Amino acid sequence: MKQKNIDEMYMHRCLQLAKNGRLLAKPNPMVGAVIVSSEGNIIGEGYHVRYGEGHAEVNAFRSVRPKDENLLCEATIYVSLEPCSHYGKTPPCADLIVRKGIRRMVCGCVDPFSAVQGRGIEHIRKAGIDVTVGVLEHECLMLNREFIVRNTQNRPYILLKWAQTANGFIGYSHITSDRKATLQISNAVTKMLVHKLRAEYDAILVGRNTEELEHPRLTVREWNGKNPQKIVLSSTYKNNGFVDDVLYVNSLQQLIDTINQRNNTEQKICSLIVEGGAHTLQSFIDAGLWDEIRIETAPFT
């Protein structure tokens, strides 16, 4: 097997491991690490389990059995994201790799965080360790797209989501005496997937019309997970702020500013779902404030 194929095989394992930290590693990135002996055996592996605790590299080295410690000098460590080079809640992983005397490091992608940005790779190379960067780079970047957007664009990762009929209608509210009767596009399976998605995101936003007509809870009910922060957007609101745990904002700029302010203090909103309605979704599209769009299309018109 060619070295390129070998590197990709172990990087795939890093990505598998990294995904285990999806819910608890935030606001840190998801990272996986695998240590492979010169004979091609995995002697250690780990992932970043929880924010504030050991990084993937630390956990991978901890998993190495005492009898295999002597193999590290000829081993290769695979890591999906560049090792950190600064002191934060934990010491630099780049220093740890150098101390362990690893022969080679294979890195999926460079960390865009301003305190790293290639410094970890440079430090390891200066120590005489062979470094390969960019193995499965696209997959590694996509895994942490929320982290990357937050650190490069200073805003949360924004997903626009809607359900529509086969001929492109998002749906409508037929106003009756009770002021609410909505066209139902989703089914039981897609509802479950929607709730799974909510559990993976930090906040969810709707416009004033949707809020007043439907009063959506926007909670996680058909999946296990934490409820996202509910946000309502309307240009008619005079004041911004929280009312009964719901955040009300009157502009897109105010939305971003409020989220950034809260991220600097307590609540970390790294990702946002925008569920509509149509006017609200269009405002995000017109402003270029989106990273991903997911559309559920019904088989009827």
Stretches with model-predicted labels:
Residues 1-24, 67-69, 73, 87-301:
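Zinc-dependent deaminase
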Residues 25-29:
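Short, flexible loop/turn motifs enriched in small residues
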Residues 31-40, 162-163:
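Short beta-strand scaffold segments in enzyme catalytic cores
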Residues 47, 54-57, 77-96:
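Local cysteine-cluster metal-coordination motifs and their immediate loop/turn environment
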Residues 50-62, 180-191:
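A short, polar/charged loop-to-alpha-helix boundary motif
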Residues 57-79:
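Flexible, acidic active-site loops/lids enriched in D/E/S/T/G that coordinate Mg2+ and/or position polar
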